[in-house]
């Protein structure tokens, strides 16, 4: 029996199916309405194939896929950003719009997010920046700075405050779940990875909406060392 699953969010509208054909595990996937791509994997026994099926199904459910007939999948509802008020949930929805297929070109990566945020009010754009600052501020700790790879913080040695900021930006840019994991466990900080473009989302959206520069000052600073509680020994970098 073929099992069918689908996943929808602000940017995704895709399906995945899986079934056993003898000792083979057969999966298909793709965008809803588009031609499916098929993958086949053969196993020594039917029991081994069944184990693989159960493993893959569990993985898809964990990622948020819903099991249901593809013929009955509801139409994808595109978000109306003009009616939304900035919140933590909306903040992460904006971040999910980043187009990582354009990696290497920060402006292109953030372009869909900038376009969405620019549809919201000026106050909401400012609140997006406030939320970003709060999240970057929370990551501004010595424990996190010690886990960023080659440029890691070491007392008494040169330490790039800008690089650490851009590494923290990469954490936020990779979404809510990753951010929460890194915030709880500094050892999960990315190594030698930055995303300075995160800092341009609100300013670019504001300029697109108003034609003016963004001069908003956030209640908390995201600059390195601003979170004094995260640097109980001060800094000597």
Q: What do these predicted ranges mean?
A:
Residues 62-82:
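Intrinsically disordered, low-complexity charged/polar segments
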Residues 44-62:
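A short, charged, amphipathic alpha-helix used as a generic interaction element across diverse proteins
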Residues 31-42, 185-194:
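A short, surface-exposed interaction/processing loop segment used at functional sites
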Residues 1-6:
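Short, hydrophobic/aromatic-rich segments at coil-to-beta transitions
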Residues 115-192:
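Core of folded catalytic or high-affinity ligand/protein-binding domains
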Residues 78-144:
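N-terminal domain-onset segments
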Residues 10, 14-39:
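Short aromatic-glycine-(Arg/Gly/Cys) micro-motifs in beta-strand/loop hairpins
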Residues 177-181, 185-237:
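Basic, alpha-helical nucleic-acid-binding regions used in initiation and control of genome expression
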């Amino acid at each position: 029996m073929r099992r069918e699953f689908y996943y929808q969010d602000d940017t995704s509208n895709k399906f995945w199916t899986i079934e056993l054909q003898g000792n083979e595990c057969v999966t298909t996937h793709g965008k809803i309405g588009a031609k499916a791509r098929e993958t086949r994997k053969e196993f020594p026994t039917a029991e081994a194939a069944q184990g693989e099926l159960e493993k893959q199904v569990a993985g898809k459910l964990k990622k948020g896929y819903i099991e249901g007939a593809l013929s009955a999948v509801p139409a994808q509802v595109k978000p109306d950003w003009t009616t939304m008020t900035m919140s933590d949930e909306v903040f992460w929805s904006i971040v999910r719009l980043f187009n990582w297929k354009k990696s290497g070109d920060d402006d292109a990566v953030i372009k869909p997010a900038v376009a969405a945020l620019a549809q919201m009010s000026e106050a909401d754009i400012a609140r997006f920046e406030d939320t970003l600052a709060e999240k970057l501020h929370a990551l501004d700790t010595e424990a996190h700075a010690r886990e960023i790879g080659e440029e890691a913080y070491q007392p008494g040695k040169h330490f790039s405050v800008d690089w650490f900021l851009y590494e923290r930006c990469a954490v936020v840019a990779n979404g809510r779940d990753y951010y929460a994991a890194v915030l709880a466990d500094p050892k999960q900080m990315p190594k030698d990875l930055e995303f300075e473009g995160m800092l341009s989302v609100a300013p670019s959206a504001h300029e697109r909406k108003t034609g003016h520069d963004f001069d908003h000052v956030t209640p908390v600073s995201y600059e390195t060392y601003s979170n004094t509680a995260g640097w109980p020994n001060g800094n000597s970098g």
